[in-house]
């Protein structure tokens, strides 16, 4: 299990570097899907299966559709690919930054312990992620509404940023 979590965390770093280093929206979308899937896998490995499923469905159902629509409207004739010099340079810079941070924090890495949600299940009556969902819907209803409005505002901001010179993205087809 430790090897699987380590592999998932390394794949998460690779996916995030793929998003940050590539200026072309097509390849960055692939990095986003990899990072979202692997991040949900990390959550599953720590016991949050329901939360990871909800996050993955929200991501694929909403944000990726908006991103694909906006990327199609802001199409480049010759996007930069994975093997271009500038992209490889950015990848090397980000890998160097990750390596430096690993070197700085390597000493205290194994001193602390992460306990998964049901790591001490003999002392608990409830499952961690399902009781968290109940708390979110009972006490976090206002925050859920605020988050929905922020996502709607983000949609309009992205559509406004990707509009052309004379015609916007919200137009009659």
From Swiss-Prot:
Q: TM segments?
A: 1-21, 24-44, 53-73, 86-106, 139-159
Q: Does the keyword Translocase apply?
A: yes
The coiled-coil segments of this chain are none
The terms describing its cellular component in GO are: mitochondrial membrane
Matching entries from Pfam families are given as: Oxidored_q3 (PF00499)
Report membrane topology: Multi-pass membrane protein
InterPro entries of this UniProt entry?
ComplexI_Subunit6, NADH_UbQ/plastoQ_OxRdtase_su6
Compartments, record wording: Mitochondrion membrane
Citing just one GO molecular function, the answer is: NADH dehydrogenase (ubiquinone) activity
Metal-binding listed as a keyword: no
Q: Where does the protein principally reside? A: mitochondrion
Question: Which UniProt key words apply to this protein?
Answer: Electron transport, Membrane, Mitochondrion, NAD, Respiratory chain, Translocase, Transmembrane, Transmembrane helix, Transport, Ubiquinone
Q: What is the superkingdom listed in this entry's lineage? A: Eukaryota
Instruction: Report the catalytic activity.
Output: a ubiquinone + NADH + 5 H(+)(in) = a ubiquinol + NAD(+) + 4 H(+)(out)
Say which enzyme class the record assigns.
translocase
The EC number(s) attached to this protein equal 7.1.1.2
User: Its family?
Assistant: Belongs to the complex I subunit 6 family.
Q: Which PANTHER family does this one have?
A: NADH UBIQUINONE OXIDOREDUCTASE SUBUNIT ND6 (PTHR11435), NADH-UBIQUINONE OXIDOREDUCTASE CHAIN 6 (PTHR11435:SF1)
Described by its record, this protein's role is as follows:
Core subunit of the mitochondrial membrane respiratory chain NADH dehydrogenase (Complex I) that is believed to belong to the minimal assembly required for catalysis. Complex I functions in the transfer of electrons from NADH to the respiratory chain. The immediate electron acceptor for the enzyme is believed to be ubiquinone.
| Protein name according to UniProt | NADH-ubiquinone oxidoreductase chain 6
Tell me which species this is from: Formosania lacustris
């Amino acid at each position: 299990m430790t090897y699987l979590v380590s592999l998932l965390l390394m794949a998460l770093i690779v996916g995030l570097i793929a998003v940050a280093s590539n200026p072309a929206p097509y390849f960055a979308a692939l990095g986003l899907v990899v990072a979202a899937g692997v991040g949900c896998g990390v959550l599953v490995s720590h016991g949050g299966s329901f939360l990871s499923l909800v996050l993955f469905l929200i991501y694929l159902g909403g944000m990726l559709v908006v991103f694909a629509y906006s990327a199609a409207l802001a199409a480049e004739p010759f996007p930069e690919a994975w093997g271009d010099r500038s992209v490889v340079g950015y990848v090397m810079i980000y890998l160097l930054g990750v390596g430096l941070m690993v070197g700085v924090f390597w000493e205290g890495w194994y001193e602390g312990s992460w306990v998964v949600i049901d790591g001490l299940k003999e002392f608990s009556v409830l499952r961690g992620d399902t009781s968290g969902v109940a708390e979110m819907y009972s006490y976090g209803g206002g925050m859920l509404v605020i988050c929905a409005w922020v996502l709607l505002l983000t949609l309009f901001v992205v559509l406004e940023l990707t509009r052309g010179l004379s015609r916007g993205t919200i137009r009659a087809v």
